Structure formats: C-alpha cells, structure tokens
Amino acid sequence: MIYEGKAITVKALESGIVELKFDLKGESVNKFNRLTLDELRQAVEAIKADASVKGVIVSSGKDVFIVGADITEFVDNFKLPEAELVAGNLEANRIFNAFEDLEVPTVAAINGIALGGGLEMCLAADYRVMSTSAKIGLPEVKLGIYPGFGGTVRLPRLIGSDNAIEWIAAGKENRAEDALKVGAVDAVVAPELLQAGALDLVKRAISGELDYKAKRQPKLEKLKLNAIEQMMAFETAKGFVAGQAGPNYPAPVEAIKSIQKAANFGRDKALEVEAAGFAKLAKTSVAQSLIGLFLNDQELKRKAKAHDEIAHDVKQAAVLGAGIMGGGIAYQSAVKGTPILMKDIREEAIQLGLNEASKLLGNRVEKGRLTPAKMAEALNAIRPTLSYGDFANVDIVVEAVVENPKVKQAVLAEVEGQVKEDAILASNTSTISINLLAKALKRPENFVGMHFFNPVHMMPLVEVIRGEKSSEVAVATTVAYAKKMGKNPIVVNDCPGFLVNRVLFPYFGGFAKLVSAGVDFVRIDKVMEKFGWPMGPAYLMDVVGIDTGHHGRDVMAEGFPDRMKDERRSAVDALYEANRLGQKNGKGFYAYETDKRGKPKKVFDATVLDVLKPIVFEQREVTDEDIINWMMVPLCLETVRCLEDGIVETAAEADMGLVYGIGFPPFRGGALRYIDSIGVAEFVALADQYADLGPLYHPTAKLREMAKNGQRFFS
C-alpha cells in the first residue's frame, strides 16, 4: 500500500500501475470535504515520491464516483471574507494541479455519477474512461455558484468553449454517449469492463502508443480562439443564457464571463480568475438561498426515509374520483410502478381520467422519456372500474372526489367497508379538516390527508396530513407511497388549509386589499413576477379557479376569523358572482384565448374593470415596494405561525413546502429564509409599518422575542 487514509487509498496493481481509490469511510457516497482534499494532497505526494510508479488509475470504491463537494461545509466556508474564499479555492486547486502535473499518465475510471468536484477531478486526469451507465456534469449553477475546482478552465480547453458553456450553464447530468461525442471522455465501456478499460488506456500511454503529454498540454494553455471568435462565442452565449436564466440567477452568465476573462491565460492564471468569480458568487444572497434549499431538501429526504421502518408496502393502490385529478394521480402511481384502480360512479369521468393518463404518458413517449412498451405497461397498470369489486386487496385508497365535506365523508365511509382492515384511506383535500372527515370512519387511525398539487405530474410536493387519530403507520405508509410516486412528502398536522394553503390565502388576502385600494391587478402581477414568482396573484387565481379560491377563502375565514375574515366584498367575490371563474371558463381577471399549441393564453379584457369597480373602496398611492410588502408580509407571518403552532415541524420543511407547493422564488430560499435575509428585527419593524392593514400584518409575540434576542430561523 503506497498510501492509506480514511477517504483515499493508493495501491499497486501491476507493472508500475497504481490505483488511487476514493472510498470515504462511513459514507454511502464519495464527496470532497476537507478530509478528502487533504488526503488527495498526501496521496499525490506519495505517488510523486515513488519512483516505481509508471501510471495512475483513479477509481471509486462506491457505486458512484464522486458526487461533488460536501455542501454542508459550504455554509461555514461561505461566511468567510471573499479574500479567504479565493485563497481556499486556490489552495484546493494546487492539489488538482499537482495531480495533473504528475510525470506519469493518469486515467479516471468513472462509474455511477461524477458531479461537480467529482468531474473536475476527472478533468485533471489525462484520460477518462466512462461506464455506459454513468453520468457526469457540473451542476453548481443550481446552487447559485459555478465550478470552483478548475471546471471553467479545463472543460472549455478540453471540449471547446461552446460545449463547455452549454454543460456549465445548464448544470445538467450528461450520459456517456453524449460525453464521448463532445470529447469529455475518451472511451465508454460496459460497467464490468471499466477497470480493464482504464488499464488498457494507461498501458497504451506508458508504452508510448498514446502521447499523454500532448493530450495534457491543451489544458495548460490558453483557449484556441482568436479575438473575433471569442467575441462571437461569448457575447452570443451571454445573451442567450441571460434570457434563459433570468435576472435572478446570475451564476450561469458569471460562469461564461469567467471563461471569457480567462480565455487568453494559461491554466494557473485562469484558475485565479475562476477563484475570484467563484468567491464573489458565493457571497451573494442567491447562493446562500439555493444552498439552503439544497440542504433543506436533504433534510426532507432524511425525514421521509425515517418513516420507512414502520411503513407498510403499497403493492396495490386505488383512487376514488376519476377526472383530471384522479387521472393525474393514477398516471403518477402507474408510471412509477404501483398498479392502481381508478373508480368513479360515472363512465364519462372514468374516460376523462384515462384520457388524462394516456395524454401524460404519450407526452413522455414523444419526448423520449418513455418507450412505447413502458407506456403500454403503465396504462395496463391503471384499471378503471365503476364498482368496489376489486378493492379487497388494495393497500391504500386516495379519495379525490369533489371538495365537499359531506360528499367526502359519505365516500370515505362507503369505501372503508370495502377494503381490508389495515388498508390506508387518504383524502386528497386541499382545505377540509382531516379530523372532521375522520368522524365518518370506524377506523380513523387508518386515515390521513394526502394533498396533491395541480398539475399532479408536475408539482413535486405532497402534503401528508396527520389527524388527531391518525396512526404513525398510516402516516409512514402514505409518506412511503408518495416517495414511491416520485414526490417530496412533507408531514403536517391538521388545521384549515394545512401548511401551503394556510400560507397562500393570506398572500391572496394582501392581493385583495391592494385591488380594493385601487391598485391595477396587472401591475401587481408584473411586480410579483419581477420579485420572482412564476406568475402573479391575479393570474394564479385564474389558473387555480376563482370558484376554488372563493371556497378556500371561506374555509380559511371560518378557521381563522380573527385575521382571515373580511366583511367587505373582494375582487374574488365580484368575479365569482359574475361567473368569471378563470381559465376554466375563459374569463377571470384576464380573458383566455387558445394559442397555436392549443394552450390557454391570457389577454387583458377591459370589461373586468366594470366588474371590479364596486369593490374598489379607495385610491391609494403605493410603490412597487409597497406592493411586495402588502403581499409578502402576511405570507411570511402565516408561515411563522404554522411553525409556532406545530403545523409543520421545522423551518426547513416550511420553506420547502412553499417552494415545492406554490413556486415560492427558489433564489429567495422560502418565507423563513426570506425573513432571515431581511433580518428578523428588520422584518418585524417592516410589518409594523403596515399594521393598519389588519391582523394579518401583526407579528407574533414569539417573533418579536426572536427579534429582540437577535435570533434567526436558520443558523
């Protein structure tokens, strides 16, 4: 053994060839943390000092190569001054450079995935051989930063600036065949031939058949583009990528700027450019928020996994209520491998549900994400029925009938008598109390809420609602089923609106106040979209359905009359009474036309102004900043209340629920991280400026205490 550490070993294989193996003890994956980087430095020094070494293979002892840097260390590192961050990056890069500069040929054998720093390690090798099942990529832009271990320097010099920009700016994982096509890897082999393929390459380099020094040289030099080619390549790319990423996500464009700035430099000087840009991005609020989201997501996955121990396996599911929602749930279950019965009392509803599932599967086939054979398999896994004849073996039933408590209670009581005693019943309600619905059941311990968001196939969140009598097994089984469906489940306790809708309706409440104060709803939409929401509140209400919003608001007003009840008529009342229900019937705040692709397109309709005129009670002058605060303060305060009331267990779950459930701007990190970014004391002072707007704007006593003590929601 030439070197042995806790993350890396170097051992002799044959004929002077050694294997540098990443295998981080106590972890399921390899990642670059302080320990791994330090051991890489020591391992390279040990190889350098051993005169018998003629070639090096870099491999992994795990199912994946290296997943990247240890993100948990980012949080502390990114608090350092910018100059220290630059110095730290350059120090790490000296280690990669030392590996790249070894006097012997080096080959990376890539299995599983090599992402971020994992791929950057491979780029420092002379050759790369990749398993057919492996994927590689530089996903750093998704964290608000760009590659910092030489990715913006080596990749453009290896595969050309155009290809490198595409890889870095998109941040996606790339398959072996695509990597080979652009020259990111030198060979692709079957997984079982990876070691042999790497050995073959290194032997050919040792024998002189391959000139590894010539292969290495372009990575050490400036980019092979003249001034005109540089201008055309980089300026065009910046314009295109800026349009794709938008103004709130600067990392992709900054990555291109870094490549451009370093184009005329050799490796070492180019790495200095990369380090400076990386440190600058690391200090931005966008990076802090996106890294926070990543860590929150990991926390969510850990919490969901903890339910696996007691969860029952769901081998057969059922959905009650077909139509668009039922069809979406059936599709999601079937496409992820759980057969499902789809029951309704009407043949036309069954047909609608089947059409929805078939359309979604067809879309996946068109995009190459599913084979026709797999589509047929998924369709066969959805069994439509008008009776309970096949319900005896069902493990979980998702009730998705009309949002009416009496109808839901009747349907749930009926199906309870048709399933086995330990079958789980789950209601896909968006606002109705689970405790109320449970009163109709003989086995309330087997009953939970399972709130999907529309459209089911696109929205990643599922709220699993724990009622007073819900058993932990029922909760755990529902969480496991949601995960199996490819969703991100969050367990919340019962209350009107649960987490997401309880928080969303105060946001709509702020919107209603603005419209009643004479503020143009089109302007409000533009301001909130610029703030980062995927759509403004008026457009969102139209998409959700004015009738759905009207019903939800009444439920919330009944549940929280002190702050959510408003005796005055609102914009939603006016539209509802005028039968302007939004996209579903072609008119809401906006009117809707069909575009070339057959999708609804919103257009301004002046007749809505007459409908809204009676609910405009004043003409108040407000700034764009006021609009943001009228909307965001009540949303944030209600999120705080949900955390304080124990509706949601952690700040991480609260924020992720809003990002996954209603499209809260990811670059702002969620409502609680948004408060942190302003400062808790500053946020309380901000809310107090709008206290005259009512109780929705009044901070809780506990939040005031946090402000006084200088506390935060996230460390």
Swiss-Prot record:
GO molecular-function term, one example from the UniProt record: long-chain-3-hydroxyacyl-CoA dehydrogenase activity
Gene Ontology biological process terms, A to Z: fatty acid beta-oxidation
Source superkingdom: Bacteria
Binding site for substrate: 297, 501, 660
Stretches that traverse the bilayer: none
Role description: Involved in the aerobic and anaerobic degradation of long-chain fatty acids via beta-oxidation cycle. Catalyzes the formation of 3-oxoacyl-CoA from enoyl-CoA via L-3-hydroxyacyl-CoA. It can also use D-3-hydroxyacyl-CoA and cis-3-enoyl-CoA as substrate.
Family in the record: In the N-terminal section; belongs to the enoyl-CoA hydratase/isomerase family.
Official protein name in the record: Fatty acid oxidation complex subunit alpha
Gene designation per UniProt: fadB
